[in-house]
Amino acid sequence: MDTRVAMISIVVENQGDIEKLNQILHEYGSYIIGRMGLPYPKRNISLISVTVDAPADKISAMTGKIGMLKGITSKALYAKLQEGCSEETD
């Protein structure tokens, strides 16, 4: 299956749906390469960066679900790599 490498940026302005956000990230956990979260108390927000290697439709579905959460926004930035297979070959 062809996959894309992408960075998903998430801004959490409302902590109310953070549990739902974590459920979504868990749902797509098999595609996640890494995740970094930074709280920013001065502005009362959290910034999360998630790196994925997944089919484009899965990335779109994940960012769409995250974007529907109240007070949480997300955007995906795709690497300019050719689509690749997630399975290793000899």
Describe each region flagged by the PLM.
Residues M1-D90:
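Long, contiguous binding/interaction regions
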